[in-house]
Amino acid sequence: MNDQRKGSDAEPTTHFGYKNVPESQKAEKVAEVFHSVAAKYDLMNDLLSGGMHRLWKRFAIELSGVRTGNRVLDIAGGTGDLTRKFSNLVGPTGQVVLADINASMLKVGRDRLLDLGVSGNVEFVQADAEKLPFPDNHFDCVTIAFGLRNVTHKEDALRSMLRVLKPGGRLLVLEFSKPTNKLMSKAYDAYSFAFMPLMGKLVTNDSESYRYLAESIRMHPNQETLKSMMVEAGFDRVTYHNMTAGVVALHRGIKP
């Protein structure tokens, strides 16, 4: 977090993309972005990743170890890609909670999953990752895919996720990260700051939201920093896997 004070009584600031804003305003500004993009979120994911996001999520599911009867929390679950798969894995004796802080994204996810016939073992909850409204030691697995970079206090969110996991439970963080070679990094910068806003303008008439998304990716901690944050939060056996030359990384940690 970028905590800056202009005086002893000044409110701490944090980054919103490349801008510094008062901490109390970040959640509202992020909400505005996702209210704007919710209706075409799936379409834009496919266009901007060339469908690769489905492969990244599939790998996260394979590494989750989720099985019949488990309880799973899908934070920032959005339109429900992971929740849908987990619903099949846990079966009628398990439970999946799709949690999202954004009401528009939550509605799109609920409507989409109901249209696909996913119900019975899925619950939808509007929740803040920093203050999860669930009991201690409740879930076998917690996932957050492409959501942690939008959280104001990432350390608080990681500790909240640790709290709700059962001992031995797994946290998986799937997030855009730092490319592992200079050529990919340069190409990815050009793609992110030129192509993403352009596609946002053409498809959703909203280039600014996609400019923020590109900036938020650059401001997110790199692979080793996020690993250290997870260890500091209390997770054991923290590892990460780079995908697409580090454009995306999947971090995994275990609750002791």
UniProtKB/Swiss-Prot annotation:
Its EC number is 2.1.1.163, 2.1.1.201. S-adenosyl-L-methionine binds at residues 79, 100, 128-129. SUPFAM superfamilies: S-adenosyl-L-methionine-dependent methyltransferases. GO terms for biological process: aerobic respiration; menaquinone biosynthetic process; methylation. Keywords: Menaquinone biosynthesis, Methyltransferase, S-adenosyl-L-methionine, Transferase, Ubiquinone biosynthesis. One of its GO terms (molecular function) is demethylmenaquinone methyltransferase activity. Disulfide bonds: none annotated. Pathway: Quinol/quinone metabolism; menaquinone biosynthesis; menaquinol from 1,4-dihydroxy-2-naphthoate: step 2/2; Cofactor biosynthesis; ubiquinone biosynthesis. It catalyses: a 2-demethylmenaquinol + S-adenosyl-L-methionine = a menaquinol + S-adenosyl-L-homocysteine + H(+); a 2-methoxy-6-(all-trans-polyprenyl)benzene-1,4-diol + S-adenosyl-L-methionine = a 5-methoxy-2-methyl-3-(all-trans-polyprenyl)benzene-1,4-diol + S-adenosyl-L-homocysteine + H(+). CDD domains: AdoMet_MTases. Belongs to the class I-like SAM-binding methyltransferase superfamily. MenG/UbiE family. Methyltransferase required for the conversion of demethylmenaquinol (DMKH2) to menaquinol (MKH2) and the conversion of 2-polyprenyl-6-methoxy-1,4-benzoquinol (DDMQH2) to 2-polyprenyl-3-methyl-6-methoxy-1,4-benzoquinol (DMQH2). This is Ubiquinone/menaquinone biosynthesis C-methyltransferase UbiE. It comes from Pseudomonas savastanoi pv. phaseolicola (strain 1448A / Race 6) (Pseudomonas syringae pv. phaseolicola (strain 1448A / Race 6)).
